[in-house]
Amino acid sequence: MTHKILPISIIYINKEMLNQRIDNFMRSKFKSVPKSMIYRIIRTGKIRINKKRIKPHYKLKIGDILKIPPIKILCDIKNTFFPLNHSTNLLNRILYEDSHLLIINKPSGIAVHGGSGLNFGVIEYFRKLRPLNKFLELVHRIDRDTSGVLILAKKRTSLVSLHEQLREKKIKKEYIALVHGLWPDHIKKISEPLLKIQFKNKQKMVLIDKKGKPSETYFQIKKKFSSSTLLSIIPKTGRTHQIRVHALHAGHPIFFDKRYGKNDLDADIKNNHKINRLLLHSSGVHFIHPKNGNKIYIKAPLDIDFQNYLNTII
């Protein structure tokens, strides 16, 4: 481990930064600085706006002058390695790009962002690959083990617009999943509240519980096989692990779901077919383009391993 001192920073707030909370702005601007340190230097008044102390919830205004003191951080030299194979793979998986948006077909097994022992996620890879992009943020998240459509915003105005569409449920996401067993024809919608809990070992689980948040998922049968069903799925809400938990609730967990699946059945299939990934894929997304107002529909083809497994059971 070694120390690095970030120099004094003076930042002039423009319209791209407008209405951001100062704590969120600092966390996005200084990603290598621990969150606890950011809140400490705000609370102690070391961060000043227009020469005045501010609260963590202060929202930035155009013309504000932000002064940030020198910050001493720890750097782990071993963790700066940037895997070239992943970065090349991600560049080959771009589905759509313009001056406002970057949309990729995320592979299974790569997290959308670093943390919890991970040095790099999709957003860190693209920030390294696109150093001239001054702004690049995730519009939404999908699970590490889920593949498919992932939207990144290249401008803050685009991020704000798409977040508003998410809140107003104007963005429609489509998924494909292979589940165990024969899905009943009558189950077309599951509306069960979901509660997220965390254990002492920091492992997180989502349970169906009346104290949870309202959640709604629509299911349509695409094809039934001898002992499995391929489903088209549309989540109306965007809760953590929503599709996976609702599928389990119906008695038909998704193939190779290490947290909510049937490990005994999955183990036999892994040995026979050499596949070991969650068979859940974000196959498409509908939204309104944040700049020109056009209706956009982006489709993401199935990964080769997912498609190859389907070919073996047809």
Swiss-Prot record:
Keywords associated with the record: Isomerase, RNA-binding, rRNA processing
UniProt superkingdom: Bacteria
Catalytic residues of the enzyme: D143
GO molecular function, one term: RNA binding
Record EC number: 5.4.99.24
Catalysed reactions, semicolon-separated: uridine(955/2504/2580) in 23S rRNA = pseudouridine(955/2504/2580) in 23S rRNA
Presence of keyword Transit peptide: no
Class in the EC hierarchy, top level: isomerase
Family listed: Belongs to the pseudouridine synthase RluA family.
Role according to the record: Responsible for synthesis of pseudouridine from uracil at positions 955, 2504 and 2580 in 23S ribosomal RNA.
Protein name (record): Ribosomal large subunit pseudouridine synthase C
Natural source organism: Buchnera aphidicola subsp. Acyrthosiphon pisum (strain APS)
Gene: rluC
